[in-house]
């Protein structure tokens, strides 16, 4: 079960726009917000500022940011390949179900790949993280910097154009998959590695308490195979035993990468 400790939500400025954003967060399902600091212990915080929303746990602060999606988009616009897109084989007009949304890095790349007529559904088991990412996507265009680097600016604009195609849902992926009709999406994607990265990375430390470190279940994979029209894709550590345990064929490539992609064709 994910940690449901209260999160202290606060404004950096008494600004009408920020108050509206605060009200939006308070309406999100499943979140345990408080506006009163605890005298017994330090609570994790979500701070709404004129420069974005920040999650803080201890000494570490995390803003919503496209992160590696920005670098990957620069590479894609420059004509280079992307292993995630090679694994998922997403096409214009496809529907992608990202069953482990995390911070939405892969979902942003997927949303760009499926184009204007495509759709990305992102599932996140933590209600706080789901709200944080949805807010970031809602305000993505505001993040675009005045970049002198034309390639970087083009990547920002491409991701901002793709971000509205992502629908964030709070929920446990296996239960959500059970409710979907058979063959209702093109690709189902799992990236449980995000949870392990949160545990090890200092930059991701504010997200650690909301991460689910449980392994993927066979039932979730069976449901994903029922729901997908084309394929189910798993990202894991290179040489991970999870591929064999869950029945995925590992794709070749990425000789120097620390990760591999596995695929089940349906």
Stretch-by-stretch model annotation:
Residues 188, 192-220:
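Mobile active-site "lid"/loop adjacent to the S-adenosyl-L-methionine
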Residues 92-102, 121:
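Conserved class I S-adenosyl-L-methionine
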Residues 1-95, 123-187:
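S-adenosyl-L-methionine
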Residues 217-265:
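Conserved Class I SAM-dependent methyltransferase catalytic core
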Residues 103-117:
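Conserved SAM-binding loop of SAM-dependent methyltransferases across substrates and taxa
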Residues 41-45, 186, 230:
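Conserved acidic residues
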């Amino acid at each position: 079960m994910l940690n449901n400790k209260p999160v202290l939500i606060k404004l950096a400025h008494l600004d009408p726009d920020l108050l509206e954003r605060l009200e939006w967060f308070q309406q999100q399902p499943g979140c345990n917000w408080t506006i009163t600091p605890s005298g017994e212990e330090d609570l994790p915080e979500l701070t709404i500022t004129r420069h974005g929303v920040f999650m803080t746990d201890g000494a570490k602060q995390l803003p919503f940011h496209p992160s590696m999606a920005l670098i990957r988009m620069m590479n894609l616009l420059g004509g280079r390949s992307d292993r995630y897109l090679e694994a998922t084989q997403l096409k214009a007009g496809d529907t992608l179900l990202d069953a482990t949304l995390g911070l939405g890095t892969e979902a942003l790349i997927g949303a760009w790949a499926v184009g204007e007529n495509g759709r990305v559904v992102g599932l996140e088991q933590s209600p706080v993280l789901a709200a944080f990412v949805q807010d970031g996507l809602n305000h993505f265009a505001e993040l675009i910097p005045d970049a002198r680097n034309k390639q970087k600016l083009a990547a920002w604009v491409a991701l901002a154009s793709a971000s509205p195609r992502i629908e964030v849902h709070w929920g446990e992926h296996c239960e959500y998959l059970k409710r979907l009709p058979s063959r209702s999406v093109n690709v189902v994607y799992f990236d449980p590695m995000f949870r392990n990265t949160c545990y090890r990375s200092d930059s991701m430390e504010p997200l650690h308490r909301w991460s689910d470190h449980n392994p993927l279940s066979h039932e979730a994979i069976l449901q994903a195979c029922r729901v997908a029209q084309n394929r189910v894709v798993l990202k894991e550590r290179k040489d991970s035993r999870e591929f064999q345990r869950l029945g995925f064929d590992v794709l070749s490539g990425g000789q120097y990468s620390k990760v591999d992609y596995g695929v089940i064709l349906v």
